[in-house]
Amino acid sequence: MDVMRIRGGTPLKGVVKTQGAKNAALPVMASCLLLKGRTLTLENVPDLHDVSTMLDLLACLGVTMERLGNRMTFSVPEEISWEAPEHLVRKMRASSLALGPLLARCGKTVLPLPGGCSIGSRPIDLHLKGLMQMGAKIEIRNGIVYAQADQLRGRRIYLDFPSVGATENLMMAAALAKGETIIENTAREPEIENLASVLRGMGVTVDTEGTGCVRIKGVEEVQGCRERVIPDRIEASTYVLAGVITGGEVTVDDIVPAHMDALLAKLEEAGVRFHVGSSSVTVFPVRRLMPVSIRAMPYPGFPTDLQPQMVATLTLANGVSLVEESVFQARFLYSEELNRMGANITIKGDTAIIQGVERLQGASVRAMDLRAGAALILAALAAEGETRIDEMVHVWRGYEASDKKLKALGADVALEEAEEK
């Protein structure tokens, strides 16, 4: 279904359970490529378009999968393909996560430059630079990466930016590299620790230290293991904000509250009352938010993947809020769609200036990417009248059964197919 219609103005109320994290599931799925004649079992894998794309990619490389609910078991044969199909890689940026494990396992790989959400410039130069430091020979011709390395070797690598994808790719490559690899200025997101846990289960010595440095001692061959995908902190935070923007009372369950500290700190600053349990957060009705200033940055800072949803929520704050984006370029394109709904957002460079308004109005809008779509859903839930959101296919990449979850909270939501042009 490509279109979501929402009739807003109803305070949401109830409990929503959190899915497994998309951004954790994809790298740990890719890590199965390190195996040889063994299996990897993952629990709590979300049912998402991006997960399906990764499954298709792994299948094309020779991996078989058995699924029971949210449990997946990947069986990897002794021999796998080292050439990734272009039509799948172009669909999803996370396809680049096959690069490190394929190169380490097969000694060579051919991988088209990946696709996914169009959010400014998102190159994989840090991935390639790190692999070359480990001994890989890499060429890019006509948008395709050709990589070769008879034996990757452990090195001390400094990332110029704490890229999540580069950290994950280099961690997987280091698992089969000769000697110790030390990666400095790494990403510190919880999803990194989830991958580290999988690699430890495979018999690799991994020390993440929690300080932006990862040490990995490579092994000749990894073993099969079982691991659970962590809860999705971005999905959980989105539903927390759905409660806030509608003036409702929503409990988000099956979470790790510490992973949401940055959001909760800003909500407290904005005047939101909430209760934090051992594995849940409940937000209570607030008449109107106070304005806040936010800078989206790598973890443990405020997550860039939550920036659009927070901007949508702040459109109804009592005053002027400032939101700066420091991770991705051109991540405010959705603001034009929010302004169509009556928001007052001005973009100056990397900062959104949000003048709060009394109310939003339903309109026809377009989800240009995954998190932009989530932001429009939040705005629609609070708006007067009906909102039509087109190109919902982007949202299905990262949110499992969002229409059903919203309906369970009392939202007036309907899905339909887009009209053929």
Tell me what each language-model feature is.
Residues 1-421:
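Short, structured segments at the rim of ligand-binding sites
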